[in-house]
Every structure is written in C-alpha cells, then in structure tokens.
Amino acid sequence: MRDSFINTLLEYGGISSLQARLLKFLTGIQKNLNQDALNLFALLLAKQSDGDTRISIEEAPLRKAISRKMQNLGIADFDQFSESIVNGASSIKQGAYGNIVDSAPDASSFYQKPFILQNGFLYPSKYYFAKVIVEDKVKEFFNHIPSDESEIPQCIRTIESITRGPQGGGITLEKEQALAVIRGRQENLIITGGPGTGKTTVTFFLLRELYLNSEKHLQAPLYLAAPSGKAADRMKESIEQSVNLIGADEFETNLVIYNKMSNADSYTLHRLLGYKPDDNKFIYNSENHFPENSVFVIDESSMIDLTLFANFLQALPHSARIFLLGDAHQLPSVDAGAVLGELLESKADSTVKLTVSRRFNENSAIGHLAKLDFSEAPCTFVPPNEWDMHSEVQLLNLDTREKSAQLQGILEKWAGEYLDSFVELAAQVVPNQPSQEELLERVWNFCTQARILSAERSGPAGVQNINDAIERLLLSKAKGANISKIIMLNRNQSSFKLYNGDTGILFTNGNGEKFILFKTNRGFVFYPEYQFAPNVLETAFAITIHKAQGSEYDHVLMFIPTRPEHPLLNRQILYTGITRAKRSVTIVATPETFKAACETVIERDTGIEL
C-alpha cells in the first residue's frame, strides 16, 4: 500500500505528473532511497500547492500536516500513508540520503542538492535559498527612520492647495495618508490597505515629495510594476489620473517631476527583471543590478510569491527606493510563499496601514460584511426563492439536496437582471464600423457592471459549469441567433499589449466572422478572433475569485464551496470576493461553509525570520 501514496496524490490532484516524474528521478540519484522517504518528498511537493515551502520532520507536526493535506484533498483513509511518511522522516533524520538532502547548504556550491534539511524542517532547495535572500535583503532595505508627525497638517494643506478635485476643491488627504507621504521621503515603505483606501494616490504624492527632496532619485529611473500586466497598467493609469488633478501653476513649477511620473513605464515583475525563458534566468540579478538610485513601486504585493520576490530583491542596488503596495487581507500568491503577510507581521515599523475606504463606508452593509465579524450581529441566510437582488448584502442558503434546481433558478434570475439587456444591446454592434463609440461604451458598461465569482473552477458551482449554464440560458432566449459573450484572456498577449485577466466581448458579424472588443488606452479596439489561439480565450460571465483580484463591479454574485472541509473555504477568499463589490453582493453558500470560511485563515509555512 505504501507505494500507492504517490498514485493517490496524482489521482486527487495533490501533485502534478511533472512532480511525479521528479520523484522517480530521485531514485536514480539516490540508489538506496526507499518508498517511505519518497512518500515524504511527495508530501513536501504536495504541500507547495497550499503555499507551504517546508515541512517539519518531527512526528507530531508532521502527522498534523499529513492529516490537513489529506482532508483538503478529500482522502478519508490515509493511516497507512501516515505511518510510511513518519518512517521516511526518521530515515532522513539519520542522514540516510546524502546525495539528495543537504544539511549544510551553500548557495555558492556548483551542485545544489534537491532538498535541504535545517533545524528540523525539510525544504526544496530553491525555496530555502529564496528564504535566505529575502531575510537578508528585507533587513537591508526596510529600516524604520522616525518622521516628524507634526508635519502632517502642513502636508494636508499643501496637497489641497496644489490639486483640483472632481468637486472643484483640492484633494484632502487623511492623516494616515499624509503620514505615508512624509515617511516616504526618507524610508522604504510597505503601504497596505483595502479597496478604495488610496494606496496609489498616496504613492503619487509620496513620489512627488521624494523627488522634490532628492535630485539623485529624480535623475534615476522610475519603475512601476506588479505581478500581472493588468495590475501594472492599472497602476500606471491611476498615476496618470493623479497627474491630471494637479493645478496648472504647480504643474508648470514641477513639470519635470510630473512628466517623469506620467511617462514611467509599467511592467510585470518578470518583464521588469528581464526574464529569459530559454535559460530560465533574469537579465537583472545579483550580479547585474538595476541603476543606482532607481525607484520601484510594486502594486498587488500580496500576489508575489517567495522566489520571484527573492529574484527582485537581489537585483536591487543598495541605493534603491522601494514602495510595496498591497492588501494584507486578500488572497496570497498562487505559487508558494506569502511575502506580504510575512513582511507585515515582522516589519510593522516599516508599514503604513490605510484604513479609510472611499469605495464603501465601513459602516455600510458591504463594509461591515468585509470585516467578517459577526459577534454582535449574526449573519442571516435566506432561501434562494426569497432573494432580493436590490439588497446591498444577501446570503443565500444553497440546499445541497436541491442544489441543481436552486442553482439554475439563481442563474436565471441573475441573467434576467444583468445579462439580457447586455445581449440585446450588443446585438446592435457592428464590429469595426465607425461612429458607434457611444454604443460601445454602453455595451461595455453593461458588461462590466456585474459579475459572477466562484471560489472553484470545476464542480456544480464552479466557473466552468456556471458559464455553460449562462450561455445555454442566453442562447435559448436568442432562439438560435448568435449572441455576444464576455470573455477573458488567460495568457498575456504581449504583441497586442493585452494581458492575462483582461476582459473582452466576443461579437459575430453578419458574415459569421467573430471579433473581440477590448478597451485599451487607445480606446475601443476590435481584434479578429483568429488572431488568438483557442486556448487563450475563456468565457467569463463567471470568473474565479482569484482572477477577480484588483477588479471592481457594481454587483457581485459569489459562490463558495458547500463541502465543509474544502481547502478554498477561508477568510481571504471571502474578503477578496466581497470587496470586489461596490453596490451589492450576494453570497451563495450554506451557513456551515460560510462559518468555516470566516473562521479559517490561510497560513503558509515558509520559515522566514525577519
């Protein structure tokens, strides 16, 4: 039975086929490698999908890790696997596999063994060395320098005097925002806050303050970056919008500064570092740094994984200025490691926390729900047939015995409210015809005002099934006519300056030719569908909550799993979905799974010590 553990992990999606081949490769390097130790290595690889970069080889925490992983995968009978893995840990403690496990790691060594054992924890080598780099570099770059808080009132008055807000007056910063501007003059910062707290706006004025006081940084490059191209472009657009709020006199006085910020390029972190896929290396690295005094603004820092962050930090010159922006409560990175969480926990003195949201009031129904605190007012669920779509917050109790029928009813109601008008209006669009800008804007607004989010990709309430159901609903109403549909890119299309996560609308003209509409900084652009590989486009009436990070919609319908011990039931996934909504959010769950999600926090074991 012991040798079936790896096959079981493969069957349940705990490891990939590539990871299984890696495990087989280990037996060629270490001839005496037994099945028990191989199962331990398999568990370590499987834990990476949970974001962990190490496991303890001490019996009690190891058994706990095994149990948690098996429950997450839905594997009920795993006692025989536990005994095998614990036995494997004992053999590794005794130093039995020196060809593949290094207990005295040296980053400069020509040959790196696949695994490292340190202080009772087993790491894949790449994560161990990334951890060491992050520990060293964070201590180098993030050191608190006390600021004079008495400057806050003057900072607020200055910003008010040089700006012209939408209502005619100047922009008034909150005290916490002004403090960030003052602190950024002399220290690197982690700026965290929820949606609408003004992280990018604060950074804009922070950069102005830095450049007014440091000619050497003004003369050096400014880099705007994020893990995704979509997030990076959105930050650049926000910076450009902030420039437009500057008064004429101030703009002329500090023209060089505002031109610098307006003209700064945006990058994905991979493109910023100069990723070379042929040899899986970066142009900028520990031996080839960015220019001295460069300034970096990195948005969506919660989505940065451990190894990418290590590569970024070791490419920086000592004179660099760094500002990391992110929301600590959002979902962490897809890949292993939770960089922002580690920094906020260990570097509180280098952190500015923005708490005042202008997207929604914290005392509003959505604002209260986002706190996920029901100690004073317990949440109330209603059956789907009592759903009030115009309520700001609704919790629908999905009866698992009638799941299919209730799900169909929910989707029919949603489509009738938000998608029927979209399809009717989109039918008036003629791809590539001039003089229909106003129509395109109206269609686009319908497309982006509401979205279905799901924690899962597959399953009855996963995005694949929901998209299929919505498409069938709309086609049945169209009586055989072609319908337009919302799509999303799942891969960067650099030649078009389109990115993974960008939303578009698929249209069909009178000749049956298909075109995709995207909204770019050049306005609306139609692209023939044939210019995209088929597997690059996904239907996106519904998208995963993870894909929705950084987006906002007026109305959100969110599905979370109905299996009580599902690994995607956690506070971060709830918070991320809820805070995408501006006007209303409906959550479809069971009271039990909603409670489980509220009480579960994603905790990643990386071993980082700062």
Predicted region positions:
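Intrinsically disordered, low-complexity N-terminal extensions of AAA+/P-loop NTPases
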Residues: M1-A76
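Short mixed-charge
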Residues: N72-A76, Q80, V243-N263, E424-R442
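Interdomain "pre-motor" coupling segment immediately N-terminal to P-loop NTPase/helicase cores
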Residues: I75-P153
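Pre-Walker A segment
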Residues: L117-G194, F204, L210
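ASCE P-loop NTPase helicase motor core
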Residues: A178-V181, R185-E392
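Conserved helicase motor core of P-loop NTPases
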Residues: H329-I487, Q493-F496
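C-terminal accessory regions
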Residues: D502-N511, F515-L610
